[in-house]
Amino acid sequence: MKRATSHRIFLLSPAYAGGERARMILRDQAQFPLARKLHGKSGAPIADVFTFLSGLYFRGKIAYANAFARPARGTSGVLVITPTRGFIDARTRIRLDDLREFAEVDIHEADPRYRMPIECDARDLATKLSAQSEVVLLGSIATGKYVDVLLANFGQRLRFPADFVGRGDMSRGGLMLRCAADRQELSYVPVAGAIVNGKRPPKLAPRKYAT
C-alpha cells in the first residue's frame, strides 16, 4: 500500500561557493546580468546564484522541487541548505557578502558554523510537520555532512529519490529536469538504512530544454 503523505518538503544541497564560477561572479568587474543583481542592493535569488555556480545539477534540483513540492500553508516547500545560514527559502535573495560568507566554510558535519544553524532549523521544521509528511533530500546521502544532521530530527520522514543510487551529479540533474518537464515524479525511500551505492543505470538520452 502506498504511503499517504500530507505534505512534501524538498531540501536542496548547496552549490560549492569556492570554485571558479564563484570567483567569476564575485569579481568587482563582473558585468553579466546575474552578477549585476548579486552586486546590487536587492541581490539575486539564491536559486539563481546556485544554479550559476553548479550548472545542470542545481538547475535540475530546483526545477524538480518546484514541480513537486507540497508545503503546508504558510511554509516553503523548497529549502536550500547553506554553509552558514541553515535552511533558506529558494526564493530568498542574497547579496555579495552572503556568497562570500558561504565561500568561507566547507560543509562538514563537525564544523559548528555549518552544523548549529542546520540543527536549529531542522528541529524547528520537524515540529511543524506531521508524521505523514516527507522531507526529501536532493543531495548526497553517501557522507554524514547532511544525513548525520537531518536524520536525528526527521527520522523516517527523511527520504531521497531511489533513482539517485548509482548516478553522478550530472546524471541526477538531467533526470530531475526530465521528470519536471514530463511531470513524472520519482519514488522516494527512507534515508535511514538506504543502499548508498548501486549499479550505474543506463545513460539518459540527450534532450534539450528551454532556458
Task: Give the positions of each predicted feature.
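Peripheral peptide segments
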Residues: 1-211
